[in-house]
Amino acid sequence: KETMPYLIYDENPYTVVTEDGKTVWVLDAYTVSSNYPYSQYTAIEHDGIKEKINYIRNSVKVIIDAYDGTMKFYVTDKTDPIAMAYRNIYPTVFEDINSEIPEDISEHFIYPEYLYNVQAELLKIYHNVKPDVLYRTDDVWSLAKYNATNVTKSTGTELKPYYTMVKENNKNEIGLVQIYTPESKQNLISYLVGTTDGNS
């Protein structure tokens, strides 16, 4: 955070063991803004601070050597103007723009839970594709609950997203899953799965 304080960092870094036996930490970093035109605001919390944003992208990965603490900042989404601006301002902090994260690390990437939670919250309303339904809020979802005592009443504790093995393109991958119900009801209506392609 002291090296690049302009990014928001995920609270759940994870370790990866490379092919040569080294252990590295993978830390997801986000660019955010509250000035993106024609975009819905949402509230986030980081470092004990609450703020409203309408733009967030997981455009930077930080690879940290678990032994000596060496940090490497990679821009994984070169279409993000904010990340590219930071890279141009601080060229010595980031790896070369053409540098790729080693495959023995990138193949173990998982979908970042912080970004997923922001997306999952917005999907409760913005799953609608019909403008009239969207503006009338006729079809709003809720996060599924457990320990609910009534099938028609919104009680119980919200079921948080969880990592599990999912099958995609005939391949088993680690994915994040969030289950939805219609608002104030307890029957499953949809679920959101987050997986990564190994590049970002």
Task: Enumerate the predicted regions with their spans.
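Exposed beta-strand-loop-beta-strand "reactive/processing" segments of non-cytosolic proteins
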Residues: Y6-I63, R136-S184, I189
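Extended, regular secondary-structure scaffolds
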Residues: K1, T23-L27, Y41, G48-I53, ...
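Acidic/polar loop patches that form or flank catalytic/metal-binding clefts of enzymes
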Residues: L7-N12, M71-Y74, Y116-N117, S200
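Accessory, solvent-exposed terminal regions and/or long lumenal/extracellular loops of proteins
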Residues: I82-S200
